[in-house]
């Protein structure tokens, strides 16, 4: 019998809080609050970091001793600066104006996507970088996804079979590989598979003058990508594997794992659905920390394999002392790292509701 009916009380309507009334009266406010929840509270920190990056990128070239034009194109430069080029550089960089005017012109140029002019390639810096950036993003993106997936699976299997020969072999082997830099592993793979066995191409991203189209072109790209990608995966695999394995070893002693076993859940379900899913939070945090390392490793790997990415472009710009191009590359790399870390923060707040509710 209902207690309220027993004492002659009517069922009271559900209580509506002030937040609920506000959402009903102003549905756009509720939608706005939901949209704000999509962004982490550290957005202000990213904006401050972005402003600091722009400031450093503006100030550093102007702190060079002597004439900035001679600092950029002196006697050691591979490109001789003509009078027309000097006048264009002074006008473009606003070197005949005050620092505040130069800063304003710099910010306006960035807002318009103008990163300067490359005097080695005789082209806009943004166009030069856009030609190389997709190759670097392809290499680092695939390395990040594949290394994370393989490391997650191997870590779960190894942690679940702790103390076995499989566990000991994986720990020893992946720790050994993780101790080498990316470019060293790349040189070894290059000597074995490209020079000795001659089963994979030695350099480049595509076969020149091959005329491949469709699936043949994709297969050619993947064939050239195999060695650089394998070099980065082998080095990154150790850290992901150890983090996942240690997390699994800790989780197997938790009460919810014992409860799942007591309910009769299959071991495969416990391994991946219960223990494996809880590895995603620390793995997501580690991913944000590994992105700068991945990009740095990709720069050296591209030089080893003559891969036409941002790393090879930066090497050429340094040799030619093309400072506008160097500035543009460093700015794009830094913005890529900031954007990737921001997306990781967003993903973390989606995976762990406690982070959302804490703010």
Report residues per predicted region.
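Transmembrane alpha-helical segments of polytopic membrane transport and secretion proteins
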Residues: 1-46, 162-163, 346-359
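Short hydrophobic, aromatic-rich alpha-helical segments embedded in or entering the lipid bilayer
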Residues: 80-112, 305-317
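Alpha-helical transmembrane segments of integral membrane proteins
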Residues: 33-36, 129-166, 209-359
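Membrane-water interface segments at transmembrane-helix boundaries in multipass membrane proteins
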Residues: 172-238
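Hydrophobic alpha-helical transmembrane segments of membrane transport/permease proteins
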Residues: 50-100, 197-218
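Hydrophobic residues within alpha-helical transmembrane segments
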Residues: 40, 44, 142-146, 173-176, ...
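Helix-terminus/capping and membrane-interface signal
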Residues: 28, 49-57, 135, 139, ...
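An internal, D/E-rich "acidic patch" concept
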Residues: 27-35, 95-152
């Amino acid at each position: 019998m209902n207690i309220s009916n027993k004492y002659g009380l009517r069922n009271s309507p559900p209580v509506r809080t002030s937040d609920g009334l506000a959402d009903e009266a102003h549905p756009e406010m509720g939608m706005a609050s939901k949209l704000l929840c999509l962004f982490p509270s550290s957005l202000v920190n990213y904006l401050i970091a972005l402003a600091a990056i722009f400031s450093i990128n503006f100030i550093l070239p102007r702190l060079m001793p002597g004439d900035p034009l001679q600092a950029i194109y002196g006697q050691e430069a591979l490109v001789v600066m003509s009078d027309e080029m000097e006048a264009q550089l002074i006008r473009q960089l606003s070197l005949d104006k005050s620092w505040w005017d130069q800063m304003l012109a710099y910010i306006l140029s960035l807002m318009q996507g103008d990163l300067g002019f490359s005097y080695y390639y005789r082209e806009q810096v943004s166009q030069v970088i856009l030609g190389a950036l997709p190759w670097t993003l392809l290499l680092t993106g695939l390395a990040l996804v594949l290394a994370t997936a393989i490391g997650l699976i191997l870590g779960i299997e190894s942690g679940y079979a702790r103390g076995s020969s499989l566990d000991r072999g994986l720990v020893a082997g992946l720790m050994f590989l993780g101790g080498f830099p990316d470019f060293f592993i790349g040189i070894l793979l290059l000597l074995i598979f490209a020079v000795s066995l001659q089963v994979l191409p030695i350099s480049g991203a595509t076969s020149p003058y091959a005329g491949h189209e469709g699936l043949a072109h994709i297969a050619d790209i993947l064939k050239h990508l195999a060695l650089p990608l394998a070099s980065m995966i082998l080095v990154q695999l150790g850290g992901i594997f150890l983090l996942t394995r240690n997390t699994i070893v800790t989780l197997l002693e938790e009460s919810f794992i014992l409860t799942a076993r007591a309910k009769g859940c299959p071991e495969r379900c416990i391994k991946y659905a219960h223990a494996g899913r809880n590895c995603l939070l620390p793995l997501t945090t580690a991913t944000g920390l590994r992105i700068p390392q991945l990009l740095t490793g990709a720069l050296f790997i591209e030089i080893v394999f003559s891969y036409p990415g941002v790393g090879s472009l930066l090497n050429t710009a340094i040799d030619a002392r093309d400072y506008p191009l160097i500035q543009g590359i460093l700015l794009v790399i830094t913005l890529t790292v900031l954007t990737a870390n921001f997306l990781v923060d967003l993903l973390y707040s989606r995976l762990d509701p406690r982070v959302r509710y804490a703010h």
